[in-house]
Amino acid sequence: AMDEAEQLRAVQAGYVNFYADDAINPYIALAARGPWVVTLNGAVLYDAGGYGMLGFGHTPAAVLDAMARPQVMANIMTPSLSQLRFDRALRKEIGHTRGGCPFAKFLCLNSGSESVGLAARIADINSKLMTDPDGRHAGRTIKRIVVKGSFHGRTERPALYSDSSRKSYQQHLASYRGEDSVIAIPPYDVDALKQAFADAETKGWFVEAVFLEPVMGEGDPGRSVPPAFYAAARELTRSHGSLFLVDSIQAGLRAHGVLSIVDYPGFEGLDAPDMETYSKALNAAQYPLSVLAVNERAAGLYRKGVYGNTMTT
């Protein structure tokens, strides 16, 4: 009979694991409910971690019951009443503190990283408009601003905005050789943020976007953005003509029990970002869904043909 370590190696022998060996749980899960996990060897473990996902615990009955009901599944090319219901549900949950949802439109995708990738695609469209020969910032070099320790996903453009992972990318990826488009400033240093935008004017840069987490998820887990820094980012991006994304995927509902940063204490009177992403707070860890919420300006920037998604409703 195999011991547990041998069992682990056997069941994962056919896979490449993304993560460090010491990050792999030292058991094989056989069954689970709520915070309890039963292992293949018969141990019963209390697991409240859930990797940021399992707020409802393992195999949540209410969620699984809802998913088991017959659904008319259609992507965005086929109008469906489920789309109207979801739109209304989102608008009900965003803007509790300000009399209504400040976002004009929603775009539905699968993974969280995909929604950030679409936000970056919209920012890319804006960058072309701004830096084309007839643009406001014609011919300028494109830069991007994040805070040190930021995390926005591991797919192509979200990875570029993720300072917490950058060391590994620079070490192993040819595409990062000489890559210097990202300005990472000390977390929540308003003066440093203002200086970055001042440098953009003197050095001929166009700042494509500022990407910001309400609560850091990787670099300094749990550290939250102060309203003053958010307000500065909102004003500076607007004045410069760039876009401001708040990536609320890692924050979920855990920060203040609300979906959007616009309802956080201290943020009620501040203008909404151009774009905001959600995922883990929406999909109950059971259904691959993420959402990019956009204001009128960002919605108007989207161009048909620059993106597509098959599976989301």
Predicted regions and their residues:
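Conserved N-terminal phosphate-binding loop of PLP-dependent enzymes in the Aspartate aminotransferase
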Residues: 1-313
